[in-house]
């Protein structure tokens, strides 16, 4: 057996998983399982920037392969197909050359939306979530156009492999400028709602969920790295919108904002539209797309229900996050695929993008006490979401270990 080719197969599989947005645990576990299927023990170390695999060949010589991980994507289609391929390789244990050919065929077979459909997804996210955050129908149209601006800029910057911080800052600034100008001209009712709706595209949903899962699985280094990425993204969003605010305030002054409290059914339709957009942006296809959208709508409805029953914002987010995480884990086992696609889309309506924006807005207006209070509230909401996800993930991790241990004893 060619140990180098086998190690390269496992490392390449881990590389593609990481590039598609997989959490660190999945990358390391997949590599371990593939090599153990061929009777080889190994050591694996993965962080968001690289994956390293080392083992001892049959002749006793050590062998190590490291792959540098560059630009990370949000390709949940590839993530699901790669997970299915790893299961197939472990079950059938084909010749290493054949397994490598399977991997190449899988990557070529991964579907992706066209550029036009990608831009449509950006429009749908802005349009849908603007209404959720209290925008009027006119604001929703503006938010859709602003979402398109974000899509155009991020798509171009991704092709140039530009720094993510600068890309996010530029997209946030260019998106917010027309909103503040339109509000100053009286062409928009609620610029805040329109901006927040469009900003949901930039909210780092995948890094947030991955950081939580990395930490609960004991991959502290990776978890901390992802947390820093999340903080930098939030800072870029705040700086970008703040720059647009400063550029327009001197001309138009402070603009007012009128929000609308929509009926829960209208909000359900809006979340449906927004989640459709996110399924496009995260490259989710087929039945999985439908299940992700159902999960997102159900999560938001439960959040509204808990709020109507008298729960405060933290408890409502906690209970909704518990449902979202449970839904993702159950769907993953029903379809025998990673829970990540379901969790990312399902939890997105709860992410505190509005809190980040209002904290920045209040600070710029000089209301520092209110800004601090809103910032602490945003941190509390993020903490409630983290606790909900971690609780469910911990329970399922314990159950998986017990089931796997029982199967090992039986064999």
What are these regions (language model features)?
Residues 130-146, 191-204, 255-270, 308-323, ...:
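Structural signature of hydrophobic alpha-helical transmembrane segments
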Residues 116-120, 140-145, 166-170, 227, ...:
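Hydrophobic alpha-helical transmembrane segments
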Residues 185-191, 248-262, 362-374:
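Membrane-interface helix termini and inter-helical loops of multi-pass transporters
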Residues 1-101, 105-107:
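Soluble N-terminal domains of membrane-associated systems
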Residues 97-110, 124-135, 151-163, 246-259, ...:
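Short juxtamembrane and helix-loop transition motifs at transmembrane-helix boundaries
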Residues 112-207, 280-282, 286, 291:
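Core alpha-helical transmembrane segments of integral membrane proteins
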Residues 194-202, 210-235, 305-411:
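C-terminal transmembrane helix-loop-helix hairpin of multi-pass membrane proteins
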Residues 128-133, 149-158, 174, 178-186, ...:
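Alpha-helical membrane-inserting segments
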């Amino acid at each position: 057996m060619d140990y180098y080719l086998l190690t390269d197969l496992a490392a390449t599989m881990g590389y593609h998983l990481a590039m598609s947005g997989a959490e660190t645990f999945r990358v390391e576990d997949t590599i371990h399982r593939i090599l153990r299927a061929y009777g080889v023990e190994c050591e694996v170390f993965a962080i968001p920037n690289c994956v390293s695999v080392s083992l001892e060949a049959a002749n006793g010589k050590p062998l190590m392969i490291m792959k540098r991980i560059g630009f990370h994507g949000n390709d949940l289609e590839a993530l699901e197909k790669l997970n299915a391929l790893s299961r197939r390789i472990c079950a059938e244990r084909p010749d290493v050359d054949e397994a490598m050919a399977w991997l190449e065929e899988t990557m070529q077979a991964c579907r992706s939306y066209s550029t036009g459909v990608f831009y449509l997804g950006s429009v749908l996210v802005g349009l849908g979530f603007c209404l959720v955050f209290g925008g009027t129908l006119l604001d929703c149209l503006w938010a859709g156009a602003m979402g398109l601006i974000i899509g155009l800029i991020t798509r171009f910057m991704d092709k140039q492999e530009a720094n993510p911080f600068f890309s996010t800052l530029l997209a946030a600034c260019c998106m917010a400028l027309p909103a503040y100008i339109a509000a100053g001209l009286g062409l928009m009712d609620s610029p805040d709602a329109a901006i927040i709706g469009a900003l949901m595209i930039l909210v780092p949903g995948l890094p947030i969920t991955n950081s939580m899962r990395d930490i609960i699985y004991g991959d502290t280094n990776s978890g901390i790295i992802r947390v820093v990425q999340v903080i930098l993204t939030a800072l870029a969003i705040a700086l970008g919108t703040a720059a647009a605010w400063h550029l327009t305030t001197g001309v138009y002054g402070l603009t007012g904002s009128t929000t609308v409290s929509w009926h829960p059914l209208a909000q359900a339709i809006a979340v449906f539209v927004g989640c459709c957009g996110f399924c496009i942006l995260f490259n989710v296809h087929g039945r999985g797309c439908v299940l992700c959208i159902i999960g997102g709508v159900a999560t938001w409805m439960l959040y509204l229900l808990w709020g109507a029953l008298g729960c405060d914002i933290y408890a409502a987010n906690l209970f909704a996050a518990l449902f979202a995480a449970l839904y993702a884990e159950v769907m993953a086992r029903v379809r025998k695929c990673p829970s990540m696609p379901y969790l990312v889309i399902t939890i997105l309506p709860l992410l505190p993008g509005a809190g980040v924006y209002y904290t920045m807005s209040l600070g710029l207006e000089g209301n520092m006490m209110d800004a601090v209070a809103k910032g602490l509230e945003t941190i509390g909401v993020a903490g409630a979401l983290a606790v909900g996800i971690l609780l469910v993930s911990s329970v399922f991790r314990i159950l998986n270990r017990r089931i796997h241990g029982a199967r090992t004893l039986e064999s």
